Structures are given as structure tokens and as C-alpha cells.
């Protein structure tokens, strides 16, 4: 068998064994995709024992390409929500996520200096303790660029593997300890969250308002500023028994009923000016109007603003809501359309059909992947990651590397959505498949390279000490941030658990947090809020630590 065929066969064996190990669960908790690392260690151990030689260049390429695929698809997935998560609504949660990364870095620095742990080893332990595989890849690359001996760099995978199991279990232990220490009642926390979230959430709401202000009588809709703002959409107007879609030139009369869509505070502002909220149905049932949901798939409208489509004037159709990546937005005139946007339309059936044809509404396109944008994005990411940044006093130029470059580019492209006919939308199933393939390839190679000396290091070397260091890097930040969040800001426990899981970019921990109260979405919401920023910081933090430690 050729060296290439043997290498591919061994990687397949590692993947099968590792994924099987990852499916093992103890009290509902398993290693998940991390099992591939241990599958690689087992196969790597026997490969060295029986002197099976694999193609080193091929392994190196597969490791780096797997990492690129993983971080790029992560960036595309979280890109649309990354920048919005930094706004006020998620600012507090993200501040705690930043604090956790900072505390973890400080603990790592103290252990490195106090116990004289070699830099590659402590960075490997750090990556495993926070269960973040891209951080391991980023640390390996920056240390290689800095000139660290290849033998030490190859040991990073062992440090990662030693710390990884407690990284998975440690966060669950911390959640349990916080619950025990503060004597938390889960049902009470869930009810408190539902009550608070129902009052404060920024989801869109509707309001039916009767026109009572005599100053508005005789004015057209376009002459009332609040009805033309980017915060509220007036989707229906009822006059007597007639229900219509209001045009910009439609004249308002006393006694008209307006159906408004927007966030609660914006709706209240309109109500104060227009009249009073009324309990009158403005349903399209039994009328000439109907509602429909259509999806944007036509390349010709990508990037265009809603006002440029002129749907009200041409077709007497109004867009009431815009759903992007699961987030409902006000369909303001200044909103630009992106591939995959879901639009709520109100109008006559024939007009809605015409508008559907304009925006595309081709459901099958949502299942197709444009490969050209994928490779453009990967190429740009690699180029960005290779650009050197020379800092006076540093022994090597700083780079985002093959982990940071594709991630930054993917975040930006995911946020932009499309450029011309190129769109970076990726169906969730395709994104997940590429992401899982990438991380399996990366972990397989890391495990194979680490397996030869793993048992010897654990039994006769410093393996047990590394496990202890990893436990400190896992536990201290989690306990610190968890206790502070609960004591200082009285954070809801379910929200707290989701925030901790998101800050560790740890899906098994999210599954555990969701299981605390299956009907509450508190944990999932806070996890999604902090995950994008946490993933970015987790990938960048070992590179920053590597450069700082290298110069000291």
C-alpha cells in the first residue's frame, strides 16, 4: 500500500473510532466531536508501536485544511449575529464572556511562570481546558512562526488531550456548584425569565390604533413622519368595512384603524400621536387581502433597499417583517435585502405572486451551495492570515494565521451577505457538514501526532500535572464569572448557564443547560448572544499569549 493510501486509511480509522467514542455518554454527557482526538491518540500509539510510517507532509496539509474549513464555516454561521451581539442588548453578557477569557489568560500566565511550564505545553493545556480546538491550531501556528522547536509544538496536542476531559466535565460541575451554593430553584428561575423576557425582549409586536388626532385628518401617510420611520411599518388600514394596504399617498381620516408593526416602545410613540390602541381585528381573513411569507433568492435584488423595489406603488404590497438568520427585523425602507431573507407580505393574491417572482422565492435554492464564494472566502482568509504585522521589540511578525484570517474574513462576509451575484449564505446542513468534516480532519491528525508519546507522558511524565493545570484554567474563570454574575447583577441562573457554555464555546454544556428546564429558551438565547465574540476571542487569545510570553 502506498504512503498516501495508508495515511488516508489511518485517518478514516481514526475518524470512525473517534466518532464512536464521542457517542459514548455517561449521565447524558459525552466527549462529542472531541472523541476524535482520543481515537487519534489510540491509533497513533499503536502506529508507533508497530512502526507504521505515515506521510508527514500530507498529514500537515490535512490538519491545516481541516482547521481552515472549520473556522471559515463558523465565521459564516455567526457572522450575521456577530456585530449585532455587541450592541446594547447583549453588552452585559458579552462583557462577562470577555472577563472569562481574560481571567483564563491570567490563570494560564500565572501557571506558566509559577511552575515553569514550557510555553507550547501550557498553550496546549489552555486550549484543551477551554475545549476550543481552533485555539489549539492557532497556537501551534504562531509558535511555529516564532521558531519554537517542532518537538515541543507537536506535544501541544498531548497537553490539549490531558486537559480536554475536565474541560467538558468542569463546566457542568461549576453549574451544579453555583446552583447548590445559591440554593436556586429552577422552575422559579424559568418563570422569572419568561416574565422579564416577555416585557423586555426586542421581538416585533403589532398594535391596532384608531386615528383620533384631528390634526392628522386629511394628511397623507407620507406626510406623517412617525408612519414613515425605520422603526414602524403601517401594513393595513381599515375604513368602515374596507381593508386596504396604505399607499404613501393614502389620505388618513378620523376613525381609521391602522395596523402597525414594530418594537413596543416605537409603537407607543406612534399611538401617542395618532390616537388610541383598540381591540379591533384587522385580519385579512374574508377580505381581498392575504398574507404570505416569501424568501429572497433572486440575485437581481440582493443588496437593494426595500424602497428601491417600490412594491407599494407598483403592486399595492407592503413588507411587514423581515426575518434574517432567525432574527425578526422591522422592514424599514432603508433595509437591504440579503439572500435567504424571509419577508412577510400583505396584499392581493395576484400582487403577492408578482412580488414573489421578483424576490425569487425559490425554496430549492436555499439547499444549494455556491462553491465559488466559498473558495473566494477561504482564499481571502488565508491571504489575510498571512499578512505580517511587524511590532517593534517582537521577535517575529504577528499574523492572524490560518485560524484567525479565515475567521475574520468569514465574519465580515457573513455580515455583508452578498456582493453582486455572489452570496455567502450557506444552508445550515451544508455549513454543518463542512464544519464537522474540517474539525474531524484536524483532530484526527492532532491525535495521530500526539498518540506515540501520550501513554508514556501520562504514566511516567508530567501528564497528571498537566491535568491539574487544565482543571485550574477551566474551573477558576468559570467560578469567578459565575459567582460575580449571580451576586453583582443577579443574573438569571438559566441565562447564566447559557452564558458560561457560550463563553466556553461548548455545545455539550449548552445541551446540559437546556436540559435543566426543557421548555425555557433562556440558556440557548444567552449562548447564542455570546458565542460569536467568545469564539473570536478564544482563537485570538492563545496567539496573544504566545507573543507576550515569547518576548518576556
From Swiss-Prot:
The chain crosses the membrane at residues 1-21, 26-46, 65-85, 96-116, 119-139, 158-178, 371-391, 393-413, 439-459, 464-484, 493-513, 530-550. The keyword Repeat applies. Signal peptide: none annotated. Keywords: Cell membrane, Membrane, Repeat, Transmembrane, Transmembrane helix, Transport. One of its GO terms (molecular function) is monoatomic cation transmembrane transporter activity. Belongs to the AAE transporter (TC 2.A.81) family. YidE subfamily. It comes from the Bacteria. NCBIfam families: PRK03818.1, YidE_YbjL_dupl. InterPro entries: AAE_transporter, RCK_C, RCK_C_sf, Transpt_YidE_put, YidE_YbjL. Residues 192-276, 279-361 form the RCK C-terminal domain. This is Putative transport protein YPO4083/y4100/YP_3992. The keyword Phosphoprotein does not apply. It holds the Pfam family TrkA_C. GO terms for cellular component: plasma membrane. Its main location: membrane. It is found in: Cell membrane. It is a multi-pass membrane protein. GO terms for biological process: potassium ion transport.
